[in-house]
Amino acid sequence: MGPGGRQSAEPASTEVFGDSDFVVVANRLPVDQERLPDGTIAWKRSPGGLVTALEPLLRRRRGAWVGWAGVVENDVDVQDEPIVQDELQLQPVRLSADDVAQYYEGFSNATLWPLYHDVIVRPIYHREWWDRYVDVNRRFAEATARAAARGGTVWVQDYQLQLVPKMLRAMRPDLTIGFFLHIPFPPVELFMQLPWRTEIIQGLLGADLVGFHLPGGAQNFLILSRRLVGADTSRGTVGVRSRFGEVILGSRTIRVGAFPISIDSGALDQTARDRNIRRRSREIRAELGNPRKILLGVDRLDYTKGIDVRLKAFSELLAEGRVKRDDTVLVQLATPSRERVESYQTLRNDIERQVGHINGEYAEVGHPVVHYLHRPVPRNELIAFFVASDVMLVTPLRDGMNLVAKEYVACRSDLGGALVLSEFTGAAAELRHAYLVNPHDLEGVNDGIEEALNQTEEAGRRRMRSMRRQVLAHDVDRWARSFLDALADSRPNDSADAAD
């Protein structure tokens, strides 16, 4: 145990070397384990922009992916052999039911997630959750140390694994280690609430390069490195994919940068042009009664996404007659998320109550004004909805980036449609020709939606053309290359301070 009864985040050193020159470490593997009726195990590929961007590099550099397979195991101390799936080497890390409850649902998603999203919901602080977070991070670090070749490169992903860089540095000081945070990094005064604030910052400082979506997150991290660890840091501003900050820790220099993540925009653009997608988009409009305007929301069912905000705005616009109920519909596609967490159960009940109230007030029999689906939607069906809709509503209270906004833009080769976008998304810094709104200002959201609905064709095409230029030029491949190029320039120094 560490000081004050805390579980120590210090791992034991290891001298075991693997054969993978490049290792990605993430909470989940890019495959899901399935048990077939005959009892055998099968692996199903999970779609995702990250694996799409990194797959060529993983193949070229004898790469491996370390992560959880998505199934609960009883014996977590068993070291599974690597799996080869579609020529990719995958190294599973086992999690028990208690691990999932305490490390994932607990510390990751009931402590860190709300804290990093501006405390929209109050974070819960439990020492038992922290201890389990330390333990699981150690297991990920150990699996990575076994997989990585001598002098290899490791890229650790996201908030669930913030202790892995320091642990891995202690085990394998020969490695080049990068870390990227896919969610917002909070303001200093909010982060300081965390009882284990110093341990998290120290964990991240085990990396050679720490990446965030936006310069603001990088600046917050530099301040916290000075305040909590006593490190010397650069004082200038951090730029996007340039002008890196630096943290000096012993004889090590850690670079800190901003790398806005993106999507496989070229592939989406091509798919959205497909004849079958276009036909399906017309069918969707017909199934909705051929309304004059379709508003669309696509989100995980999460309290950060502001689904309630757009429903309130739509209700007020209907009440004030600024939107006509006989020619405008709102479609909300809400993917189930973290259904065992109480705050998410409450959110679902609240959203469904709102939908029922709006339809009860404004719908006609057989013609609801809000169409709500609480289930996953197949990828091509989602693309057809993007093509069919007139206004995309993206109204999070806080979001690290929001890739749905970029996906919508990538699908609109016709230059149709409009994007209403929260100022509190990372995407707002890049999609400046969206209708930007403050989700905390309901009247402002109402005005933004009304303006988007009533834009002229010329203005809409001009806005969409500008946003598409940005999204198509800055795709997920460019994001990955920019991070990894910066990481290659951040080779670790050989020193006795490597694990400081």
Swiss-Prot record:
Enzyme nomenclature, EC number: 2.4.1.15, 2.4.1.347
Pfam families from the UniProt entry: Glyco_transf_20 (PF00982)
Binding locations of D-glucose 6-phosphate: R28, Y104, D158, R338
CDD domains linked: GT20_TPS (cd03788)
Record: residues binding UDP-alpha-D-glucose: G48, G49, R300, K305, L403, V404, A405, K406, E407
A biological-process GO annotation: trehalose biosynthetic process
SUPFAM superfamilies (UniProt xref): UDP-Glycosyltransferase/glycogen phosphorylase
Gene Ontology, cellular component aspect: cytosol
Record keywords: Glycosyltransferase, Transferase
Catalyzed reactions per annotation: ADP-alpha-D-glucose + D-glucose 6-phosphate = alpha,alpha-trehalose 6-phosphate + ADP + H(+); CDP-alpha-D-glucose + D-glucose 6-phosphate = alpha,alpha-trehalose 6-phosphate + CDP + H(+); GDP-alpha-D-glucose + D-glucose 6-phosphate = alpha,alpha-trehalose 6-phosphate + GDP + H(+); TDP-alpha-D-glucose + D-glucose 6-phosphate = 5-methyl-UDP + alpha,alpha-trehalose 6-phosphate + H(+)
Biological or metabolic pathway of the protein: Glycan biosynthesis; trehalose biosynthesis
Keyword Acyltransferase: no
A GO term for molecular function: alpha,alpha-trehalose-phosphate synthase (GDP-forming) activity
Marked site: Involved in alpha anomer selectivity: W113, I183
InterPro entries recorded: Glyco_trans_20
Family (UniProt): Belongs to the glycosyltransferase 20 family.
Self-association and partners: Homotetramer.
Function of the molecule: Probably involved in the osmoprotection via the biosynthesis of trehalose and in the production of glycogen and alpha-glucan via the TreS-Pep2 branch involved in the biosynthesis of maltose-1-phosphate (M1P). Catalyzes the transfer of glucose from UDP-glucose (UDP-Glc) to D-glucose 6-phosphate (Glc-6-P) to form trehalose-6-phosphate. Probably also able to use ADP-Glc, CDP-Glc, GDP-Glc and TDP-Glc as glucosyl donors.
PANTHER family: BCDNA.GH08860, TREHALOSE-6-PHOSPHATE SYNTHASE
This protein's name: Trehalose-6-phosphate synthase
Organism this protein belongs to: Mycobacterium ulcerans (strain Agy99)
